[in-house]
Regions:
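Accessory, non-ATPase domains that flank or precede helicase/AAA+ motor cores in DNA-metabolism machines
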Residues: 1-292
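Loop/turn positions that initiate beta-strands
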Residues: 45-49, 566, 583
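Short, charged beta-turn/beta-strand-edge "cap" motif at the junction between a beta-strand
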Residues: 53-58, 572-578, 641-644
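Pre-Walker A segment
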Residues: 131, 262-332, 345
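ASCE P-loop NTPase helicase motor core
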Residues: 315-318, 323-493
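Conserved helicase motor core of P-loop NTPases
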Residues: 439-578, 589, 598
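C-terminal accessory regions
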Residues: 584-701
C-alpha cells in the first residue's frame, strides 16, 4: 500500500538506525495517523510517499508500518523548475531546469527517479550534470539504491533493516560473502541467506555454501541435542556426498573466521565455546573467602517469627550461605527449599541491612511464584539483564554490571549455558551467589547441563535437602517423586491416582475427570503435540468442553486454530516491553475480528496481539512438560501415551508429577510409566563445562 502524506510532527527518532515514529496527515483525505519505520532525516511539514501497511501494535494500537519512505517530489511546472534550481543541484540553472521540464513533461522528476536514463534525451545536458541531477533526486527522496538492491535479492523490509543496522557498507559485505549476515546478524536465518545467495547468482559449487551448511548443521545439532559441541564424526555422518577433505577445509575456514571453535575432536559453535569459558572464569571470580557469621541465634529468631522448625539439614544450609560466597541448594518437591530460602533472606536482611539482594528465575511464572513465596521482589533473568529482543543483546554486562551484593536464582536447572554466561558477566566481582534447583528435573531447553556440571565440578559447596516435610494433603505426590528419584517401587496414594487406559481411551477418561474441575487450579501435561492423546487434540477437546462456540463470544481463526473469548492460552515468545514472557498463561478477554486483534489477560496485564503477533499464542488447557517447568498447580493430569514412549524419559516424568501440589492423576499405560522411570538416561548431554571449571578453579574450602 502506498500513501502520500505530510509529516506533521515527530514522536520519536533513533538517529543511529533511522527508526522514526511520527504523526502524518494523508494528502488526499486529510486522515491523521501514526507511522513507524525507517525514515532517513525526517523533516516536519515535508510530503512523503510511504510504502507499507496498517497494523495493530500490541502496545500502541493502530499505526502504519513503514517499509519504505521517500520524500514526495514536486509535480507542477513552477515547483519542479524551482526545485531543480535548488541547493540539491549545484550548477543546474533555470534554463537547464526549464529544458528538462519541456523535454520530459509533467511528473518529470518522478520519471527521472524511476528511469534516470531519460535524462540523456534532454538536449545539451552533459554527463556531469546528469550525475548531479540523479544524485540530487536520490538524496532528496531518501531513496536508497542499497535498499532497492536488497529488495531485489528477495529480502523483506525487516531483514533489510537488520542489515542496515549492522553494516555501514552492506553491499560490499554481501559481495564479499553473502552468508556473512547469517553468521553475524541475530534473526537472519540460514534459509534467508540461501535465498539471497541464489538471487545474487552464487554458484551451487561455491565453498561458501558448504561452510554455511556445516555451521547450520552444528548449530541445529546443538539445539536439538542440548550438546555444546559435536564431533568430527557426527559432521562427516551428516554431510553426505561430499569428500571429507572438502568438509575439513570448510571447518578450517569457519574456525579461522571464529564461527566455529575446535578442540581435539570437538567442534563448538564459537559462542557456546565462549560461554563455557566465560562461566569457568566467572566462577573463579566469585569463589572468594568471606567473613563467617554465626547465625545460630538468628535461625531461632526466624523459626519463632515464621512459626516453623528447621531440621539440622536446613540449619546447615542456612549457616553455609553465610560462610561461602557461592552455594548451590538442591532438593526434590516437599524438601523445604523455599522455607530454607525464606530463612536465608530474613537473616541476610538483619545481618547485612544495607546490602542489595536480588531474586530472579528463568521464567515469568517462576519469578512470580518466587516473589509470592518469599515476599520479596523477583524478576526474570532476561528482564534483570535488560535483554534486547531485537538483537539478542543484554544491557547489563561487564561494562555496566548490576548493582547487587547477593543474587538468588531459583529453578536453576532451566538455565542454559548462554544465559548463565550472560548473568555472570553482569555480576559485580564481589557479588555472592545462591543457585536453587532440582537436579533431577528436565535440563534447560537450550544447550548445556549447567546445574549438573556445577555440582559435579565439586568446587561449589552444594547442599542436597532430602527429608520430605510436605505431609498434608497431596503427600503421596512427594513420596512418588522420591520413589522415582531413588528408583524404588512406585506407590499411588494420598493424592495420587493412576487411571489405566489404552491410548484410544485416554481422552474419554480425561474428559470424565476434568469436566467438574476448577480450571484455574488444574493443568494437563502431555509429552508430545501430535496424536489422539497429544497436546493439540486435547486442547481441541478441552475447548469444546470448557468454552464451546456461542453467539455471545467472539472468535477468530488463526491458521488451523480457532481462538475464542475465554480461551486459556499460552505465550510462545518473550515480550519484554510488556513484561510477559514465553510460557506465561492467560485468558482471552476480547477478540476484535475487524481489527484482527486478540486481547489476553496475563494476571492483570492485558496485552493486545495483532496480525503479526497472533502466532505467539497457543491454547493452554494442555501444555508440554517443558513449558510447565518452574510452575506448580493444585491439580495435574499427566498423560502417559505409548506413542510417546521415546519421549517419556525419567526426567520428564519426574518433572511432570512434581508440578502437582495436592492432586495428581496419571492417565495411560501404567506398565510403561513404571518401566520408563527406572530407565537410565538414553541421551546424556555432551559439554565441556565441568572440565573447564576444574581446569581454572580450586575449591576455596
Amino acid at each position: 500500500m502506498d500513501i502520500e502524506a505530510r509529516l506533521e510532527y515527530i514522536i520519536f527518532e533513533n538517529k543511529a538506525n533511522h527508526y522514526v515514529v511520527a504523526g502524518f496527515s494523508e494528502l488526499k483525505t486529510y486522515h491523521n495517523f501514526t507511522a513507524a519505520g525507517r525514515i532517513e532525516d525526517p523533516i516536519e511539514d515535508q510530503e512523503y510517499v510511504l510504502q507499507g501497511e496498517y497494523v495493530k501494535h500490541p502496545k500502541y494500537g493502530e499505526q502504519f508500518r513503514v517499509d519504505m519512505a521517500k520524500k514526495k517530489l514536486p509535480d507542477n511546472s513552477d515547483a519542479i523548475i524551482h526545485f531543480l534550481c535548488g541547493e540539491n543541484f549545484p550548477t543546474i540553472g533555470k534554463k537547464t531546469a526549464e529544458s528538462i521540464y519541456e523535454t520530459l513533461g509533467e511528473n518529470c522528476l518522478e520519471k527521472i527517479h524511476n528511469n534516470p536514463e531519460l535524462l540523456h534525451e534532454v538536449p545539451n545536458l552533459t554527463a556531469k550534470k546528469i550525475l548531479i541531477i540523479q544524485k540530487g533526486i536520490q538524496e532528496f527522496t531518501g531513496f536508497n539504491e542499497t535498499y532497492a538492491k536488497l529488495l531485489k535479492y528477495g529480502l523483506s523490509p525487516r531483514q533489510i533493516q537488520m542489515l542496515l543496522d549492522t553494516y555501514d557498507n552492506v553491499l560490499d559485505v554481501i559481495e564479499e560473502d553473502c552468508f556473512k549476515p547469517y553468521y553475524e546478524v541475530y534473526g537472519f536465518g540460514y534459509k534467508t541467506a540461501c535465498k539471497m545467495a541464489s538471487a545474487i547468482g552464487l554458484s551451487n559449487e561455491d565453498p561458501r555454501r558448504l561452510d554455511a551448511y556445516i555451521y547450520e548443521l552444528a548449530r541445529q545439532l546443538s539445539m536439538a541435542t542440548g550438546n555444546t559441541y559435536i564431533t568430527f564424526a557426527t559432521i562427516f555422518q551428516n554431510v553426505r556426498g561430499v569428500n571429507e577433505s572438502l568438509i575439513q577445509e570448510s571447518i578450517d575456514r569457519l574456525v579461522s573466521l571464529q564461527y566455529l571453535y575446535v578442540e581435539n575432536t570437538r567442534i563448538y559453535p564459537f559462542t557456546l565455546h565462549e560461554d563455557e569459558v566465560t562461566i569457568a572464569k566467572g566462577l573463579k571470580n566469585h569463589l572468594f573467602e568471606v567473613e563467617s557469621v554465626d547465625v545460630e541465634s538468628k535461625i531461632k529468631q526466624v523459626e519463632f517469627s515464621l512459626a516453623i522448625t528447621y531440621d539440622q539439614e536446613q540449619k546447615d544450609a542456612i549457616q553455609l550461605f553465610f560462610d561461602r560466597s557461592f552455594m548451590i541448594l538442591t532438593g526434590g518437591p516437599g524438601t523445604g527449599k523455599t522455607t530454607t530460602v525464606k530463612g536465608i533472606l530474613e537473616i541476610c536482611k538483619d545481618v547485612y541491612p544495607d546490602s542489595k539482594i536480588q531474586l530472579c528465575a528463568p521464567t515469568g511464572r517462576a519469578s512470580k511464584r518466587l516473589a509470592q513465596l518469599s515476599n520479596c521482589d523477583s524478576r526474570t533473568i532476561h528482564s534483570l539483564l535488560q535483554w534486547n529482543l531485537e538483537d539478542n543483546s543484554f544491557g547489563k554486562n561487564e561494562e555496566d554490571p548490576l548493582d547487587v551484593d547477593f543474587i538468588i536464582v531459583d529453578e536453576f536447572s532451566m538455565v542454559d549455558t548462554h544465559l548463565f554466561a550472560q548473568l555472570l558477566k553482569a555480576l559485580p566481582q564481589r557479588c555472592r551467589i545462591l543457585l536453587i534447583g532440582d537436579e533431577d528435573q528436565l535440563e534447560s531447553v537450550g544447550p548445556g547441563k549447567v546445574l549438573e556440571d556445577l555440582i559435579k565440578s565439586d568446587v561449589i559447596d552444594t547442599v542436597h535437602l532430602k527429608k520430605i516435610f510436605r505431609q498434608s494433603s497431596g503427600s503421596g505426590i512427594v513420596t512418588l517423586a522420591k520413589e522415582i528419584r531413588e528408583e524404588t517401587t512406585c506407590h499411588y496414594e494420598d493424592g495420587v491416582e493412576f487411571i489405566e487406559r489404552t491410548t484410544p481411551k485416554i481422552m474419554d477418561a480425561l474428559i470424565d475427570y476434568v469436566k467438574d474441575m476448577d480450571l484455574d487450579s488444574m493443568q494437563i501435561l502431555a509429552p508430545m503435540y501430535k496424536g489422539a492423546a497429544g497436546i493439540d487434540e486435547i486442547n481441541r477437546q478441552m475447548q469444546v468442553l470448557f468454552n464451546p462456540k456461542s453467539p455471545q463470544k467472539n472468535q477468530m481463526k488463526v491458521g488451523t486454530t480457532i481462538f475464542r473469548e475465554n480461551d486459556k492460552v499460552m505465550l510462545l515468545k518473550n515480550l519484554p516491553d510488556e513484561d510477559v514472557y514465553n510460557g506465561d498463561i492467560g485468558t482471552i478477554v476480547e477478540i476484535d475480528s475487524k481489527q484482527n486483534v486478540i486481547s489476553v489477560d496475563f494476571t492483570n496485564t492485558i496485552v493486545d496481539f495483532s496480525t503479526d503477533f497472533l502466532y505467539y499464542l497457543k491454547h493452554a488447557w494442555c501444555i508440554s512438560v517443558h513449558k510447565s517447568q518452574g510452575n506448580e498447580y493444585q491439580t495435574v493430569f499427566c498423560i502417559v501415551d505409548v506413542n510417546a514412549k521415546n519421549m517419556l524419559e525419567k526426567r520428564l516424568l519426574y518433572t511432570a508429577i512434581s508440578r502437582a501440589k495436592k492432586q495428581l492423576f496419571i492417565i495411560g499405560n501404567k506398565s510403561l510409566f513404571e518401566t520408563q522411570v527406572r530407565l537410565k538416561l538414553k541421551r546424556i548431554r555432551q559439554t565441556s563445562l565441568q572440565e573447564r571449571i576444574n581446569e581454572v578453579t580450586e575449591k576455596i574450602f
